[in-house]
Structures are given as C-alpha cells and as structure tokens.
Amino acid sequence: IIADEPTTALDVSIQYQILELLKEIKNLNISYKTRKETIVASSNVNFTLERGEILGIVGESGSGKSTIANAIINLIDPPGQITSGIIKIDNNELQNKEEIIQQIRGKKIGFVFQDPQTSLNPLFKIKDQLIETIQTHLNLSHDEALQKSINLLEEVGIENATKRIEDYPHQFSGGMRQRVVIALAISCEPDLIIADEPTTALDVSIQYQILELLKELTKKRNLGVIIITHDMGVIAETTNKVIVMRHGLIVEQGNTKDLLNNPKSSEARSLVISVPPTNKKIERFKLISPDGSEITSSSANLTKNIIKTWGVRKNTNQKLLELKEITKIFDDQSISYRKKIDDNAVKAVNNVSFKLFEGETLGLVGESGSGKSTIAKIITGLVRPSFGELEYNGLSLYNSRRKYQIDKSRGQIQMIFQDPYSSLNPRFKVRDIIAEPIKFFQKNITRNDLEQNVNDLIDIVGMTRKSLDRYPHEFSGGQRQRISIARALATRPRLLICDEPTSALDVSIQAQILNLLKDIQDE
C-alpha cells in the first residue's frame, strides 16, 4: 500500500493517534436493556492489539465476539450500550468522541461484516459502491477510482472484474458478495482491519487467498488485524494470538500455537476437538461438555422427540431424486424465457445428472459461482430449469413436454439456506417462523400439538425456549442459522437440501448440528 500524504487533512492530535495505532480495551462491559431484562453481551473484556499483530477472537454463537468488534467503531445497535470500560487508540479514549471515530472509521479502520447480503446496497451497482467509498476518503478522480475498484476486485479473486463491476449484489453468489465486501474494506488502505467472519461464505481456495492477502497486508503495512471467526483453521493459519469467549467472558487467551496445542478451558478444548480430521472418515464428531468431559451421544434425547412426531421410516433403498441433463441459463438481457439466448447469457448449470437414494447423503462441492446453489434451488422449485428432466419419488416434476409441477413435492423437500438473515422474516417472532410451515401443511393441528412441535424443534437445534418470543435481529448469525434449520425440519421432510448449513456456526455447534442431521437420517 502506498499512502500519499495520508494525514495531511487531519489535525496533529488525530495524526498522532492514527500513525501510532494501538488498540487497547480495558474492563469493557456491554449490555442490552429490554423491557423484561438486561442481557449482558460482554463482561470485563481486556486485550491489546499492536501493529503487525493478527488477533483472533473465537467462541460459540452469541458469545459476544461481534459485539466487541462493533463497540470498537461505535456501531452497537440500540438498545445495546457500553455500560463501563475503556476503548483506546494509542492511549486516547474514544468513548463519546464521535468526531475522532468518524475520522478513522472507513479510512483507517476497515470493517468486513459477517453478512455480505446486508452489507451491500441492493439498489446500486458494485462499481458505484466502491467508487463512492474510495472518493469519500481518497483524493482520486472518478476514472482513477474506477480503475482502483477493478484492481481491488481482481485482488480478491473475482474473474472478469471489468464486466462484473457493472453488476448488482444479487447477481453474485454468496461467496462472491463476501469478496466484494472485503474489497470495500481494504479500498481506503486502512491501518486496522476488523474482519467479522471474513471467509465464512468463501470456498477453501478463495479462503486461502483472502487469508494470505490479510497476512501480506499486515506484514507490508505493519497493520493490526482483528479476525472474529468460528473456524479454528483460520485461527491456526492466520493469527499470532487468540482470545476464546463464552457468554460475554474471555475464558482463555494467549499465543495461538500454545493455546491450540494445550487448551486449558473446556470451551477451548471443545472448539479444538470438534475440528474433523482430514485423513479419515468419522461416524460422529466428538463433543466436550462445559465440565470438560466428553459427550458420547449429543442428541439421543432429542431424537426421541423427533421420532414421536416424525415417525420411523424403513430404509427401502428407493430412488428418491434424479436429475437428467439439467441445464440452467440466466440471460442478463431479458427475464423472458422465450428470448433467444445471446452471448451475454450465463450458463449456471450445464448438463448435470445424478441420483439420490433414501438414506444417502450426497455432497455437492465446488468454488463460489460453480452452480451448487442453483442446483439446490432447481430441486426445491425456487428456480425453473432451462432444459432437462427432474424426478422426485417416481414423479416427474419437470421435463421438456410438461409444466413445472413442483407442487407435487411441496413440503417433502425442504432447504436450509446459506444466508440465515435474509431467509427469515424480520417481522415474525421465532415461534411464528417455525410454526408457519407446520400450520400450512397440517391444517387441523391443535394449538397444544403445534406448541409441542415448536418446542421440540427449538430443543433439537440447541436453543432455549425463551428465544421463541424474540425476533431474528436479536440473535447472532449462528443462532439465526439454527432457527433456519428448525424451520426446515418443521414439515418432516424426506429430502433435506443444506446449502452451506453450518457456514455461520462455530465448530462445536457445527459438530452438534451435523451429528443431529446424521441421527435424524438414521432414525
């Protein structure tokens, strides 16, 4: 990064703060006050970050990781507030000093948010959003800002950047949207990068590129980087030191290598032991209870509730799903299916065929934009194929001679979406979100049975029943994903399509959910 007079327009005191950037947090306490109760999001948090360091903050969903990051740049949503403690940059307190925060936010502190869908403005092209950010903080002409924007997209791994920069956010896959967000964060050459789950939506090859980029920037520019993640692989490969959080408390912190090799707290042990081995297949993930003992069966009691309402199906080895030469073409010039395909059309799925039998688990893997999610949406009826045949349980749902007949399988095929926030109705409480599909497919269900089913489902995904009376925005990303899973299970599906179902979850919760899905399948 070449910084051309980066502090010329700032007064001397702010220049000093920026050039000697050092993040220090002392006894930080953050809480959310509601009418019924006060929820403590963080309690007595203490840590420092020096230039050239990469600090990892890891912990289960709802442990307070993202809240700490938002507090640093004064972006805590109401009714959240800092009740006590100190946040410093080079020994200068930032509380109630909005002018200083505005000077450094964006230009000297870059932020990568967890949810790329809600971080980008759906009404503006990527080009406009990048140029606006660059010209707000850097003295560049429109053409210079445009060229810098194209270079940034190429740097974060977006092919054909000159063309893609003209697209809107919805025209990118989840992983590609996250790359755009990262490009925005580094666009103004910051001194500190706060990355909240920066690689959650990216495939492994692009994850590696982004993490290498962060390490390279840290070394060349002598940056400070805070990475908030649930991915222990990211922690091991990238960070110098790590903080483990649980229920708003720091339960362990230290050198990354020492902590991973010899975790002392049960929380740290749980995160380390839940990482699956790459050299062998395992039947179940190991889990650690809060007292430090190993859990041999994580969901035995929960599956009893499933069997009670679901029933037990015999494994017949029956063919459940078949795709025959499925092709999907998106024409960016017209929404008409009858228009002749032109040179700008995107062939998202090309001649794909496979079968799935009852009791089987099929893994569909590929880089961002390879067509994985499009195939999932075709099977569930959210996207209509251009060509090919689709059969479910012996019924033809689509072929070249018939209308799309996805209603035949409605309810029996359910999907867990990649982005938990945009797939949940923000106006519904969790109770209503889970109950809605049950009421739709079981018209005559009694109120008591409905309530019992909802309670069982929220138990299954490891959340308290108090959460049923809250709204989606009141939860962390991982907790929202668990709500999505509960809703998908509500109709007792025969085929469950999981589009990155654990991407927003920490590794210990990933292990619980995957063990649970395996138990449901076995039953």
Region locations from a protein language model:
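A short, proline-enriched helix->beta-strand linker immediately N-terminal to the Walker B motif
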Residues: 187-191, 490-494, 510
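Conserved ABC ATPase "signature" region
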Residues: 144-163, 448-466
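Conserved ABC transporter NBD signature motif
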Residues: 82-93, 388-398
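Helix-to-loop junction immediately C-terminal to a conserved catalytic motif
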Residues: 73, 77, 380
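ABC ATPase "signature
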Residues: 253-254
